[in-house]
């Protein structure tokens, strides 16, 4: 029975470049791999064909011979009749694909980078707006100062793992397929510590608390995060340290509310000032300032004081302070005050005075119309 053309087996043209051949091989090998088709003889035979075609077409000398003579170039035993031996570089083809599937992966496992740490910092609004420097104390893992992170007793060195010979990987055969797995002896590090450090017991790190000075820039707000590079936990066996992230939480203020770079506050005034107008003092983060209140001011009126808010943490313009007026109803009136208010109300023409209380008139006119419509 005539053998199928190698190019046809891989589904590539005769002018295909090596990267196209590798791509086609990877796709087909994954599809017909024996571990994915256990007990399927056809898939097993197909996989052998794919492997054989790949070995020929990725070897420049064998490919040239095949292009000139076809399968006859290898009929005298040049290919050795199939099987899984030969020169196919499976670590190159499957290192990233099958590494996760079969627990392998290429190369020695790198020592793990230190873990990142998080510190929640609570600030007052004044501290957040102006900026502040604070000292914090955090528990962490630091590099052992005796072995300097190696884990080995001073005067000794980590030894090359005899199982994987320093590669961190061991090769396992599963049917027709050879896969690499993390060395169980050294856990992928490629080295073993025969004489561990007495202080860190071979870990290369020790538990310790450290104090840091953290500069908080002006303008930060709840949810902002400040990164201190390299201030997290020390890495394993000399690997880089992680980072420390300071998470900002701004306390609720008794007077001001913050929205972005603007501040809001409520300013209570009595109804006489609301009607006649006047001048009051309002608080800001820099002290008290005077605010002119025009006559006939209603509850909810906003007065904007430009530049009295928060400076952006990213630079640029400063926010504003917005004062919301709340007109207070007087309480604890004496008889004389009640009499004066009664006279004032009568001068308005009653509770729905049309001229002096236009909103009241509009409201009661609407109520009257509503009930009139119901009775029709």
From Swiss-Prot:
Induction section of the entry: By heat shock.
Metal-binding recorded as keyword: yes
Cofactor note: Binds 2 Zn(2+) ions per monomer.
Binding annotation for Zn(2+) 1: 144, 147, 197, 200
Location within or outside the cell: Cytoplasm
Statement: the UniProt record of this protein carries the keyword Zinc-finger: yes
Membrane-spanning intervals of the chain: none
Cofactor(s) recorded in Swiss-Prot or TrEMBL: Zn(2+)
Keyword annotations of the record: Chaperone, Cytoplasm, DNA replication, Metal-binding, Repeat, Stress response, Zinc, Zinc-finger
Zinc fingers (CR-type) by residue: 131-209
Residue sites binding Zn(2+) 2 per the record: 161, 164, 183, 186
First and last residues of every CXXCXGXG motif repeat: 144-151, 161-168, 183-190, 197-204
GO cellular component: cytoplasm
J domain sequence ranges: 5-70
GO MF term (any one): zinc ion binding
GO BP: chaperone cofactor-dependent protein refolding; DNA replication; protein refolding; response to heat
Physiological role: Participates actively in the response to hyperosmotic and heat shock by preventing the aggregation of stress-denatured proteins and by disaggregating proteins, also in an autonomous, DnaK-independent fashion. Unfolded proteins bind initially to DnaJ; upon interaction with the DnaJ-bound protein, DnaK hydrolyzes its bound ATP, resulting in the formation of a stable complex. GrpE releases ADP from DnaK; ATP binding to DnaK triggers the release of the substrate protein, thus completing the reaction cycle.
Subunit-level organization: Homodimer.
Domain notes: The J domain is necessary and sufficient to stimulate DnaK ATPase activity. Zinc center 1 plays an important role in the autonomous, DnaK-independent chaperone activity of DnaJ. Zinc center 2 is essential for interaction with DnaK and for DnaJ activity.
HAMAP family membership: DnaJ
Similarity annotation: Belongs to the DnaJ family.
Protein name, entry field: Chaperone protein DnaJ
Organism: Escherichia coli O6:H1 (strain CFT073 / ATCC 700928 / UPEC)
Organism phylogeny: Bacteria, Pseudomonadati, Pseudomonadota, Gammaproteobacteria, Enterobacterales
Encoding gene per record: dnaJ
């Amino acid at each position: 029975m005539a053998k199928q053309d190698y190019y046809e087996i891989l589904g590539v043209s005769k002018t295909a470049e090596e990267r196209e051949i590798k791509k086609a091989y990877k796709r087909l090998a994954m599809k017909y791999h024996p571990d994915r088709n256990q007990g399927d003889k056809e898939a097993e035979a197909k996989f052998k064909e794919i492997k054989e075609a790949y070995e020929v077409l990725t070897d420049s000398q064998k490919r040239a011979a095949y292009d000139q003579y076809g399968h006859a170039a290898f009929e005298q035993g040049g290919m050795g009749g199939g099987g899984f031996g030969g020169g196919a570089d499976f670590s190159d083809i499957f290192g990233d694909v099958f590494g996760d599937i079969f627990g392998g992966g290429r190369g020695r496992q790198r020592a793990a980078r230190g873990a990142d740490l998080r510190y929640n910092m609570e600030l007052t609004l004044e501290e957040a707006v102006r900026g502040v420097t604070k000292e914090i104390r955090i528990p962490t893992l630091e590099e052992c100062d005796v072995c300097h992170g190696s884990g080995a007793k001073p005067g000794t060195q980590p030894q090359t793992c005899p199982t994987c010979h320093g590669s961190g990987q061991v090769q396992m055969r599963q049917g027709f397929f050879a896969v690499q797995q993390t060395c169980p002896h050294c856990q992928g590090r490629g080295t073993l510590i025969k004489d561990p450090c007495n202080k860190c017991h071979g870990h290369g790190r020790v538990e310790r608390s450290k104090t840091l000075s953290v500069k908080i820039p002006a303008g930060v707000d709840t949810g902002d995060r400040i990164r201190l590079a390299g201030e997290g936990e020390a890495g394993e066996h000399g690997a880089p340290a992680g980072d420390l992230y300071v998470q900002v939480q701004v306390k609720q203020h008794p007077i001001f509310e913050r929205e972005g770079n603007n501040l809001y506050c409520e300013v209570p005034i009595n109804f006489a000032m609301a009607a006649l107008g006047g001048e009051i003092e309002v608080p800001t983060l820099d002290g008290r300032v005077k605010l002119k209140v025009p006559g006939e001011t209603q509850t909810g009126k906003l007065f904007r004081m430009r530049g009295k808010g928060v400076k952006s943490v990213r630079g640029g313009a400063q926010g504003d302070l917005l004062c919301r007026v709340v007109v207070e109803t007087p309480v604890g009136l004496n008889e004389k005050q009640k009499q004066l208010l009664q006279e004032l109300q009568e001068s308005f023409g009653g509770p729905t005075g049309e001229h002096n209380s236009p909103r009241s008139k509009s409201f009661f006119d609407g109520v009257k119309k509503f009930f009139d419509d119901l009775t029709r």
